């Protein structure tokens, strides 16, 4: 890894990978930004075939600053991301942290829009975007749109995590003062993390489709759906700032637990099919 230069980078892309090298390469190749103005921190979460630095760089810009942290065993996304945040502690050579998941694709303007927005809105600490969910094996896709203003975001957080994890970017300085991704909310660690961040700052959603997120039947959100819903209930109970919205949110989540995941996904596709 090249030696860091003070204030050299606009952002760090934080991404973890477990046995998905091809998806990782596709995701990193989709980033359209000056490669000397950002760096990638990759956490290899104990992949059976270790991710080799030289192999990855063969598929990426030679100017890209890529650092790989290899975990000795598969520890799950929460601990993998926290290992990345721990590595970043104390560094002052970048301004923002952006998330990306293996298999997901960035639009050409994603990072230009998010960096520009945060630069132009110093009161905002966390920014996400609309996105498209797509099953690449069938071509089926549906859109995900949500309110864009902080007040509406705070209201809707009682009902769901409005931030799709790989769409977000946040200020590194703010995150450095917060706890890491919580391990007390299995498979909803991002919900807890963003809700905690919202206790200390403001957020916005950009009304543009800046990501295509892969739908996979083996993805964590589907394979651990009930545990995720239980964790989401715990998040709402801990962070709600409205008793009414909190109760409505918990009832909604409990009803979702009764609905098979296949039905829930089918309903989403029918409502938002494109």
Where in the sequence are the language-model features?
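Acidic helix N-cap motif at the loop->helix transition within catalytic regions
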Residues: 23, 48-59, 105, 109
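A conserved acidic beta->alpha catalytic loop
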Residues: 44-54, 73, 101
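Short beta-strand-to-loop acidic/aromatic patch adjacent to the donor-nucleotide binding site
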Residues: 93-105
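Conserved nucleotide-sugar donor-binding catalytic segment
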Residues: 147-231
